[in-house]
C-alpha cells in the first residue's frame, strides 16, 4: 500500500483538509486514537511505532511512556513540530498498516476538519478591516500569546481543556487527587490546573477570563472555607456564572470535598453540588463528575 493516503474504502478526510494543523482534531478523536494506539500488541503498530515515524528520539519516547495516555501526549508534543498536520498523521498511520484506525475514525476526523475550516472562515469574516500600518502597531494581547505550557507561542493553536479547576492553594492535594481520578484513568479528561498548566508572567485576571470563557468547556469549583476568602476564586466563579446565567448550560460544577465551618456560598446554592463528604454517595462521586464534564 502506498504511504500517500488511506486504503481504498476508508473514510479518511479528503485531500483538501489534509494540510490542516493537528489542532483541528478535537478531544473525542484524540481519545479514540489513544484507545487504538495505547495498547501494546505484537500484531499491530502502536504509539511507539508512530512516535518513531514522527522522528521522536529514544529518550523522548521513554519519557512519553511514563504518562497514562502516551498517545495523547505524543500528539500534543508533535503538533508543535514542523510538518505536523492531519494529512501527515494519516500518511503515517497508513504506512504503519493501521487501516483499522482510518476506517473507524475517518468520518470523525473529516467532521473535525470541516468544523475547523468553518470556524476559521467565520473568524476571518468577523475581522474588522484595518490599515496594515495601523494594525501592525497594535500590541499583541495575552489572548494571542502562549499562556499555557502546550500553547503555540504565537497563539495560532491555543490549548483547550475539558474543565478549568477553580481552587485555593490549600486545597491542592484534593486537586491532585482529581487529576489522578479524571486524567490518569479511562476517563482521560483534560483539566486546566493553574499551578501546573499556566505560564507565569501574565495578569491572573486576564488569564482566568481567557481560559474560562474560550479554552475550557466547563469549570469545577472546589469549595472550602479557604475558598470563601479568596478574591481570585470569587472572581473566577462570578465570571463563569455570568457566562451561563441560571446554569442553563451546566457550565459550572461545585464540589464540596471536606466539612466546612462557614456557610456554603449563596451564589452556588441553586446548582447541584458534587458532595465528596457524603459517605453514602462517595463511591459514585468520580463517575458522576466525569460524566458531567464529558457532556457536549
UniProtKB/Swiss-Prot annotation:
SUPFAM superfamilies: DEATH domain (SSF47986), Toll/Interleukin receptor TIR domain (SSF52200)
GO annotations of cellular component type: cytoplasm; nucleus; plasma membrane
Molecular function via GO: TIR domain binding; Toll-like receptor binding
The keyword RNA-binding is assigned to this record: no
Biological process annotations from GO: defense response to Gram-positive bacterium; defense response to virus; inflammatory response; innate immune response; MyD88-dependent toll-like receptor signaling pathway; positive regulation of canonical NF-kappaB signal transduction; positive regulation of interleukin-1 beta production; positive regulation of NLRP3 inflammasome complex assembly
Chief location bin: cytoplasm
Location of region: Intermediate domain: 110-155
InterPro entries: DEATH-like_dom_sf, Death_dom, MyD88_Death, Myelin_different_resp_MyD88, TIR_dom, Toll_tir_struct_dom_sf
Pfam families in alphabetical order: Death, TIR_2
Keywords of this entry: Cytoplasm, Immunity, Inflammatory response, Innate immunity, Nucleus, Phosphoprotein, Ubl conjugation
Subcellular location, record wording: Cytoplasm; Nucleus
Residue numbers carrying Phosphoserine: 244
Ranges of residues in domain Death: 32-109
Keyword Nucleus: yes
Domain TIR: 159-293
UniProt PTM: Ubiquitinated; undergoes 'Lys-63'-linked polyubiquitination. OTUD4 specifically hydrolyzes 'Lys-63'-linked polyubiquitinated MYD88. Deubiquitinated by USP3 that cleaves 'Lys-63'-linked ubiquitin chains leading to inhibition of MYD88-induced NF-kappa-B signaling.
Protein function: Adapter protein involved in the Toll-like receptor and IL-1 receptor signaling pathway in the innate immune response. Acts via IRAK1, IRAK2, IRF7 and TRAF6, leading to NF-kappa-B activation, cytokine secretion and the inflammatory response. Increases IL-8 transcription. Involved in IL-18-mediated signaling pathway. Activates IRF1 resulting in its rapid migration into the nucleus to mediate an efficient induction of IFN-beta, NOS2/INOS, and IL12A genes.
Self-association state and partner proteins as the record states: Homodimer. Also forms heterodimers with TIRAP. Binds to TLR2, TLR4, IRAK1, IRAK2 and IRAK4 via their respective TIR domains. Interacts with IL18R1. Interacts with BMX, IL1RL1, IKBKE and IRF7. Interacts with LRRFIP1 and LRRFIP2; this interaction positively regulates Toll-like receptor (TLR) signaling in response to agonist. Interacts with FLII. LRRFIP1 and LRRFIP2 compete with FLII for MYD88-binding. Interacts with IRF1. Upon IL1B treatment, forms a complex with PELI1, IRAK1, IRAK4 and TRAF6; this complex recruits MAP3K7/TAK1, TAB1 and TAB2 to mediate NF-kappa-B activation.
Domain remarks: The intermediate domain (ID) is required for the phosphorylation and activation of IRAK.
Protein name: Myeloid differentiation primary response protein MyD88
Amino acid at each position: 500500500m502506498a504511504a500517500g493516503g488511506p486504503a481504498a474504502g476508508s473514510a479518511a478526510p479528503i485531500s483538501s483538509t489534509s494540510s490542516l494543523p493537528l489542532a483541528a482534531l478535537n478531544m473525542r478523536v484524540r481519545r479514540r486514537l489513544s484507545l487504538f494506539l495505547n495498547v501494546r500488541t505484537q500484531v499491530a503498530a502502536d504509539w511507539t511505532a508512530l512516535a518513531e515515524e514522527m522522528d521522536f528520539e529514544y529518550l523522548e519516547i521513554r519519557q512519553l511512556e511514563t504518562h497514562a495516555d502516551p498517545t495523547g501526549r505524543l500528539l500534543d508534543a508533535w503538533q508543535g513540530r514542523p510538518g505536523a498536520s492531519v494529512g501527515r498523521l494519516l500518511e503515517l498511520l497508513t504506512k504503519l498498516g493501521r487501516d483499522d484506525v482510518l476506517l473507524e475514525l475517518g468520518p470523525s476526523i473529516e467532521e473535525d476538519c470541516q468544523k475547523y475550516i468553518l470556524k476559521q472562515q467565520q473568524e476571518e469574516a468577523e475581522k474588522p478591516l484595518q490599515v496594515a500600518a495601523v494594525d501592525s502597531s497594535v500590541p499583541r494581547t495575552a489572548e494571542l500569546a502562549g499562556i499555557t505550557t502546550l500553547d503555540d507561542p504565537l497563539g495560532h493553536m491555543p490549548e483547550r481543556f475539558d474543565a478549568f479547576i477553580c481552587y485555593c492553594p490549600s486545597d491542592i492535594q484534593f486537586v491532585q487527587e482529581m487529576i489522578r481520578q479524571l486524567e490518569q484513568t479511562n476517563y482521560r479528561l483534560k483539566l486546566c490546573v493553574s499551578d501546573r498548566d499556566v505560564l507565569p508572567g501574565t495578569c491572573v485576571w486576564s488569564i482566568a477570563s481567557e481560559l474560562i470563557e474560550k479554552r475550557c468547556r466547563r469549570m469545577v469549583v472546589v469549595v472550602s472555607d479557604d475558598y470563601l476568602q479568596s478574591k481570585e476564586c470569587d472572581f473566577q466563579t462570578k465570571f463563569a456564572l455570568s457566562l451561563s446565567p441560571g446554569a442553563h448550560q451546566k457550565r459550572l460544577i461545585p464540589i464540596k470535598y471536606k466539612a466546612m465551618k462557614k456557610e456554603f456560598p449563596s451564589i452556588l446554592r441553586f446548582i447541584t453540588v458534587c458532595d465528596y463528604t457524603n459517605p453514602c454517595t462517595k463511591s459514585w462521586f468520580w463517575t458522576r463528575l466525569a460524566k458531567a464534564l464529558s457532556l457536549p
